[in-house]
């Protein structure tokens, strides 16, 4: 209701003719400015301009609108980024299981992989057999620059090209030796700037359930891949 009144006020101030504006501002002074009424009367308009009081009112309204809108925009942005982070892990989960079930690296063993990789890198989600053929890829090329320390445990969310503000990395909860990879995988997603890009770290393992936890990092700091398999379920 307050926001609607403020919007109406802005439109009246900016769009009405001078005589109508003068009457409207007089009414505004009586109802909102109280004892500033006399000061408002003493202010002289320059030709085609506004009084100091009127400019102060407009500046105040802009400040109020900014205070109302900016936090909501930030929340919406964070929610969108976190939803995309969950989708990243869903994509990696599906790719891992396709790699596992179909023995796509052709080694005769059903196993997972800890590599995002790139074209020509075998035993990776980007190129299971190392053929260099994009049709064999289980994930697209944007993952190549979104991964941290590919093939090993990720520590800090610092990657060349984050996806929706998140980097991905291999989880420290899972080994990277051949025996471990026969039964489990683990990927995590962490934000490049805590509380401005996202609030939560995410992870997923062979049980296929996305886990999440609120980052402990201060605002603006890189995420530290804090989610583990013991975290609560987070949807997806």
Give residue spans per PLM region:
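Disulfide-bonded cysteine motifs in exported proteins
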Residues: 5, 152-155, 228-229
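N-terminal single-pass transmembrane signal-anchor helix
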Residues: 46-73
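Chalcogenol-based redox active-site neighborhoods
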Residues: 69, 90, 229-232
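Aliphatic-rich helix starts adjacent to a transmembrane/signal segment
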Residues: 72-89
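Extracellular/periplasmic head regions of type IV pilus-like filament subunits
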Residues: 94-200, 206-207, 233-236
């Amino acid at each position: 209701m307050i926001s609607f009144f403020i919007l109406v006020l802005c439109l009246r101030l900016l769009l009405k003719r001078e005589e109508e504006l003068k009457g409207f501002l007089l009414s505004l002074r009586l109802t909102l400015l109280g004892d500033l009424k006399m000061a408002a009367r003493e202010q002289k308009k320059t030709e085609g301009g506004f009084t100091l009081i009127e400019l102060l009112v407009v500046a105040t309204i802009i400040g109020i609108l900014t205070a109302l809108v900016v936090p909501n925009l930030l929340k919406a942005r964070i929610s969108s980024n976190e939803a995309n982070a969950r989708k990243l892990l869903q994509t990696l989960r599906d790719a891992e299981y396709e790699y596992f079930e179909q023995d796509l690296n052709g080694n005769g063993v059903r196993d997972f992989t800890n590599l995002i990789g790139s074209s020509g890198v075998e035993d990776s989600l980007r190129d299971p057999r190392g053929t260099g053929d994009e049709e064999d890829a289980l994930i697209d090329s944007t993952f190549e620059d979104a991964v941290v320390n590919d093939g090993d445990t990720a520590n800090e969310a610092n990657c060349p090209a984050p996806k929706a503000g998140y980097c991905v990395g291999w989880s420290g909860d899972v080994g990277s030796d051949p025996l471990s990879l026969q039964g489990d995988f683990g990927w995590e997603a962490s934000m490049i700037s805590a509380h401005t890009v996202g609030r939560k770290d995410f992870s997923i393992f062979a049980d296929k359930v996305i886990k999440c936890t609120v980052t402990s990092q201060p605002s603006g700091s890189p995420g530290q891949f804090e989610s583990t398999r013991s975290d609560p379920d987070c949807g997806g």
